[in-house]
Amino acid sequence: MKNVVIVGGGAGGIELATFLGNKLGRQKQAKVTLVDRNATHLWKPLLHEIATGVMDDGVDSLSYRAHGKNHFFSFEQGSIIRINREQKYVELAPVYGQEGDMLVIARRIPYDYLVIAIGSKSNDFNTKGVADNCIFLDSSKQALRFQHKLLELFLKFSENRALDDIGEEEFKQKLVDENKVNIAIVGGGATGVELTAELYHAAEDLSSYGYGKIDSSCLQVTLVEAGTRLLPALPENLSAAVLDELKEMGTNVQLNTMITEAQPNTLITKDGGEIKADLIVWAAGVRASTVTQQFDGLEINRINQLVVKDTLQTTVDDSIFAIGDCAALIQSNGKLVPPRAQAAHQMAKACAKNIFALFENKPLKSFKYNDKGTLVSLSNFTALGSLTNKFGKNPLTVQGKFAQFAYVSLYRMHQHALHGCIKIGLIILVDKLNRYLKPRLKLH
């Protein structure tokens, strides 16, 4: 029996493992193994909702082991550290517990076909101080860290206001501005914009849960973008509409502003200016992990992505595929396939078909990315975007309730790929029930 190993359980990796398990694993044509450093899967485009407490990671995450049991693939927890192409195995680092004790030793996982789907991480562009003084939103662990710090900040702010009321200012805790909670977000892409909107919405809800007289006026978000406009993937008119919406919420948007250094509670701009904040998030650009440099001579580009052919096979080794954000595939227009969830979803389907073809001794097919458009959610305020128009050259502009429905449907499509029609219907029902049974925000 052949071994098919998928490294990375993100949007593309877990969908691919599900497709392969349901066919090759079920029919015992291959042993399908999924490898990930975490025990659970969470759809990365929704990490900003985990960060603000809108989404509960405990409810919305998916156990790899449980999902594998239901879809005929096995799961190995661990981080890949290298590939041996000659002997055809991947080496995984040991797994350690919270107390630092080793739970699982280093292992070698043999493969006949290997798929790398390790995604991407925030690109700090080697900016001084960013790693030490900023929070990234690349994982649920980082999103939860942000959420805990956010709740602590609002608790401090609420307590300071209460001390003002009773005249005991000497006990107040220090914030960069005693009149507001200040948060700086670097990066005017989808993550930065959506996080900004969710923060203002969360601030409005906190007063309902015992945080005192807090509303969105108590929050100041500074959104910093090095380019000339927000959301460059959107048409200019929609980018301008997003800018207007954020400003109406109270956001301080700084365009054409490059950050050269991050210090504790301070960002330094290229012109020498300072941006003070109680909490700083870095969401500017992405790159693949440097671990790809240890992949036994596979071709990588300047941001560590694995260069692949149109069949999604790596240029050096036909038995190794790469999909999602970690794959560099040049399209016919000369541009790389963008690092988006919809690209990972399409690549997972195409890769599964090509692996099926290998088992059936059939020719592999070329992958062609179909850009279906871009959607951005501004929390409960609105949503907008542009969708590909099959009947004309100009994209369709969508806004409001239809755009919100389309945005939510992207996540439902991912869930459908994992669970099928019946289970996704039950999941939607449970989600609706949870709106009535649970608080709007996760407060712990």
Swiss-Prot record:
GO molecular function: NADH dehydrogenase (ubiquinone) activity; NADH:ubiquinone reductase (non-electrogenic) activity
Membrane-related topology note: Peripheral membrane protein
Chain positions recorded as NAD(+) binding sites: V186, G187, G188, G189, A190, T191, G285
Cofactor(s) the record lists: FAD
Chief subcellular location: membrane
EC id: 1.6.5.9
Cellular compartment(s): Cell inner membrane
GO cellular component: plasma membrane
Catalysis: reaction(s): a quinone + NADH + H(+) = a quinol + NAD(+); a ubiquinone + NADH + H(+) = a ubiquinol + NAD(+)
Keyword list, A-Z: Cell inner membrane, Cell membrane, Electron transport, FAD, Flavoprotein, Membrane, NAD, Oxidoreductase, Transport, Ubiquinone
Record flagged with keyword Oxidoreductase: yes
InterPro entries, sorted: FAD/NAD-bd_sf, FAD/NAD-binding_dom, NADH-Q_oxidoreductase
Residues that coordinate or bind FAD: G8, G9, G10, A11, G12, N38, S120, D325, A341
UniProt cofactor note: Binds 1 FAD per subunit.
Primary enzyme class: oxidoreductase
Family recorded in the similarity comment: Belongs to the NADH dehydrogenase family.
Function, as annotated: Alternative, nonproton pumping NADH:quinone oxidoreductase that delivers electrons to the respiratory chain by oxidation of NADH and reduction of quinones. Utilizes NADH exclusively, and electron flow from NADH to ubiquinone does not generate an electrochemical gradient.
Name of the protein in its database record: Type II NADH:quinone oxidoreductase
Organism in which the protein naturally occurs: Haemophilus influenzae (strain ATCC 51907 / DSM 11121 / KW20 / Rd)
